[in-house]
Regions:
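Active-site-proximal structural segments of metal-dependent nucleotidyl cyclase/transferase enzymes
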Residues: 76-104, 120, 187
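Conserved nucleotide-binding and Mg2+-coordinating catalytic segments in signaling enzymes
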Residues: 55-75, 92-106, 114
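A short pre-motif secondary-structure segment
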Residues: 129-132, 169-170
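Short regulatory alpha-helical coupling segments
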Residues: 56-57, 70-86, 117-125, 143
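Active-site-proximal alpha-helical element of nucleotidyl cyclase-like catalytic domains
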Residues: 108-129, 137, 161
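Alpha-helical scaffold within the catalytic cores of cyclic-nucleotide enzymes
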Residues: 117-118, 149-166, 192
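Signal-transducing coiled-coil linker helices
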Residues: 15, 23-63, 71-81
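Catalytic-core segments of nucleotide cyclases and related cyclic-nucleotide turnover enzymes
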Residues: 151, 179-209
Length: 209
């Protein structure tokens, strides 16, 4: 009888251990699946976040030049007007750009736009904001400098661009209008007026006041 009881005890113990082992295997499998799902969710969220970040950046930058676009300008300009009492706005236009496109082709026109963008960015400080405002027109927001100082900086850029050598010895020039917040609350309108004056004066000029 005792041997029989011992046998039943052993069988019962083995059976319980077998059930426990099967339960543990199921739990391990469950946690593996759960871990995989969580990992996929994390990776998916990271990928989605990076894609959204990329598309947001693309939405605020110009595709050709990689500087800020018109949408970015509208946002930053309003922020500057609301919060900053010492900033200048520059409106820049490539002179006779339609003739450049007509005579040398749009590919060369794109080269000119990229080259001028690069010159502007290199000659400005890191905190200055450069925008492709549209077509052959650019805008620049500069903080903590007064109008005369900004006009001098932009004139140096104008000279550098006029002296730049392009294909077939083509000469490209820019005109620019500068305005400061201390001169007018509507800085954009003032800068546009000064750009128009620069054009009227024969182009290849920077006008402030």
């Amino acid at each position: 009888i005792r041997d029989s009881e011992t046998s039943f005890y052993i069988i019962d113990k083995v059976s319980n251990e077998s059930k426990l082992f099967e339960k543990t295997k199921k739990e391990i499998k469950y946690y593996k699946i759960l871990f995989t799902v969580i990992l996929i969710a994390i990776l998916g969220s990271t990928f989605l976040y990076n894609r959204l970040k990329y598309f947001k950046a693309q939405n605020l930058h110009d595709g050709l030049t990689n500087v800020y676009n018109r949408k970015s300008f509208d946002i930053m300009y309003e922020k500057y007007r609301e919060k900053d009492d010492n900033f200048a706005l520059v409106m820049i236009d490539i002179d006779n750009f339609k003739l450049i496109n007509d005579n040398y082709g749009h590919k060369f026109g794109d080269t000119v736009i990229k080259g001028i963008t690069n010159t502007i960015c290199v000659m400005l400080e890191q905190d200055d904001k450069v925008f492709r405002y549209g077509g052959e027109e650019f805008s620049v927001l500069i903080r903590n400098k007064f109008g005369e100082e900004v006009a001098d900086i932009i004139d140096n850029i104008r000279v550098a661009i006029a002296n730049k050598k392009w294909n077939d010895d083509v000469t490209v020039t820019i005109s620019a209008g500068v305005a400061h917040i201390s001169d007018s609350k509507d800085v954009l309108e003032e800068a546009d007026k000064n750009l128009y004056k620069a054009k009227q004066l024969g182009r290849n000029k920077v006008v402030y006041k």
